[in-house]
Amino acid sequence: MTAIQHFFKTFFLTELLKGLALTGRYTFRRKFTVQFPEEKTPISPRFRGLHALRRYENGEERCIACKLCEAVCPAMAITIESETRADNTRRTTRYDIDLTKCIFCGFCEESCPVDSIVETQILEYHGEKRGDLYFTKEMLLAVGDRYEKDIAAAKAADAPYR
């Protein structure tokens, strides 16, 4: 680019006019704003939301305390403590997820051999304090119990792709 061309581009502000023309084209188009609490957008079937722990049909929790989810978690958001029962099976005594650390990658769900930990379609949860986003085993089991039908349906729909 020669010095004269550069002078005319900067003197007549051609870049600025191109930007204003682009802005003007989008000014009168239809807006894509969604009024969130009243209007909902469609959620992907593979959306990863709030975590839940599942139980078997007989009421026993699925988690066998293999700690694969704790090992695979890149954010180190999962803490598990376990003990051996009288029948030589391991079960968790503590299963905590810190949602302030969690990046919702889904590795915990993928690594679980018994489909104990799942990520639900729930996206509307909050906490007033930092401690409200620290989910214990009992809280995760309560979420799983409450939404078991939805979780099972989502797992069945996603089964052909896994």
From Swiss-Prot:
Membrane topology: Peripheral membrane protein
GO cellular component, one term: plasma membrane
Boundaries of every 4Fe-4S ferredoxin-type domain copy: 54-83, 93-122
Cofactor: [4Fe-4S] cluster
Catalytic activity: a quinone + NADH + 5 H(+)(in) = a quinol + NAD(+) + 4 H(+)(out)
Keyword list, A-Z: 4Fe-4S, Cell inner membrane, Cell membrane, Iron, Iron-sulfur, Membrane, Metal-binding, NAD, Quinone, Repeat, Translocase, Ubiquinone
One BP term from GO: aerobic respiration
Cofactor: how bound: Binds 2 [4Fe-4S] clusters per subunit.
Enzyme class name: translocase
Enzyme Commission no: 7.1.1.-
Binding site for [4Fe-4S] cluster 2: 73, 102, 105, 108
GO MF assignments: 4 iron, 4 sulfur cluster binding; iron ion binding; NADH:ubiquinone reductase (non-electrogenic) activity; quinone binding
Chain's role: NDH-1 shuttles electrons from NADH, via FMN and iron-sulfur (Fe-S) centers, to quinones in the respiratory chain. The immediate electron acceptor for the enzyme in this species is believed to be ubiquinone. Couples the redox reaction to proton translocation (for every two electrons transferred, four hydrogen ions are translocated across the cytoplasmic membrane), and thus conserves the redox energy in a proton gradient.
Family membership: Belongs to the complex I 23 kDa subunit family.
Identification of the protein by name: NADH-quinone oxidoreductase subunit I
Species per Swiss-Prot/TrEMBL record: Burkholderia vietnamiensis (strain G4 / LMG 22486) (Burkholderia cepacia (strain R1808))
